[in-house]
């Protein structure tokens, strides 16, 4: 059973008690809200011209995410989950897509990106700044591009993407605790974030606030 402390993460939800239907916004147009992609994307996410996502690596991990969000997992298998991801990307129709993946979900996510973009590049990366923690970033673009992400830690790669890639806005519909939000804010870029877990989103909101972001809340 997941502990109450685990469900609440660092307790940011007490300061930023985001609820269903609320939108947290910054002055530059960046927005965060609660959403489950199996039920649809927030409309503002469809305005992004760049996407970075780090989806669950397996059906078991996905089920655990729903448990932590105190919700029932609505998909029967991982392929069904990937189909929801693809549908969301098609609705956004971005110029560039970056998908972080791991050994367990790489075989499903690479073909998905290949079906959406004419140019696909796969970078080998690490996470937690540990060489033995391997991951990959799958890049889908309309033109051949190399953003120099090979070998980087995923944290540094996301900050590099937000700093160097010429997008107008970036969306992450698995926003979690807000790596993409922090990186985009640090680069002065607009971001759109959503996640089904309000406690995780509260951490993202808090981390951007600690970088100077001033949030307003609307319904």
Locations of regions flagged by a protein language model:
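Class I S-adenosyl-L-methionine-dependent methyltransferase catalytic core
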Residues: 1-219
